[in-house]
Amino acid sequence: MADKLIKATAKDGQVRIIGAITTELVNKGIEVHKCSPTGAAALGRMLTAGSLMGSMLKSEKDTITIKIDGGGEAKGVLVTAYPEGKVKGYIGNPLVHLPLNQNGKLDVGGAIGKNGNITVIKDLGLKDPYIGQVPIYSGEIGDDLAYYFTVSEQTPSAVGLGVLVDKDLSIKASGGFIIQMMPGADELLADFITYRLEEIPSITELISKGMSIEEILEFIFEGMDLKILEGIVPEYTCDCSREKIDRALISIGYKDLKEIYDEGKTEELVCQFCNEKYFYDHEKIGELLRIMNN
């Protein structure tokens, strides 16, 4: 089933829903980073979460960055997302490998660890970005983001994220949802939705059956007057460029850049999101120094 992200409401606007299938998106991300199965599941969940939360931004110039690091062998995962469904990310240790957990599944929680925080940074074009941070709840990422929404944004939420890794290490199914109760929503409705989520199969199981994201949400919210508002195609993409790397080098300051110049070596800089390589020889670094002097 093709990747798609949709926004919807249920029960006369009492519930806000964002759901997505992200199989192709996550496949591209793990191909870039050459992930192990556990690394793929961790990065894939974060990329899916990023695409969902990015779609909640209001302005096309807004960005959101989500970072989780609990001291585990994954060495942290970071994603940056945009309103139109584009997302990029990286994992500190893409080859992280742990035994299966007690449920016989990839141990994402163990790879992430629990001794740390999940941090959400929203750049909304204001003087300072919004930064929200909460302790890691489980390391499974979905639970941690639900805890973040409830504590930091005071919005009771359910977050479901799933990544099914195939035997050939490709992604067989990936997707997720964020379900939020709006102010004034019926508490019994929240309890019913919680019960419903506990009873249904996992989102990756539903995707594997060939269900579209519309069909999945119709299934979850059966009899709850689901209204689909809009849809976009989420995508793994990196916006790095020579100009951005130039600005990053200039930002380290004249003194430090001059020291690099005086060494006379060609420097190789690698984008952590897409592994694109940028080479700066003696002449190119000299050009940047001249720009800084003007």
From Swiss-Prot:
Keywords: Chaperone, Cytoplasm, Disulfide bond, Redox-active center, Zinc
SS bonds (residue pairs): C238-C240, C271-C274
GO CC terms: cytoplasm
GO terms assigned for molecular function: protein folding chaperone; unfolded protein binding
Superkingdom classification of source: Bacteria
BP term (GO), one: protein refolding
Family: Belongs to the HSP33 family.
Listed name of the protein: 33 kDa chaperonin
Organism listed in the record: Clostridium tetani (strain Massachusetts / E88)
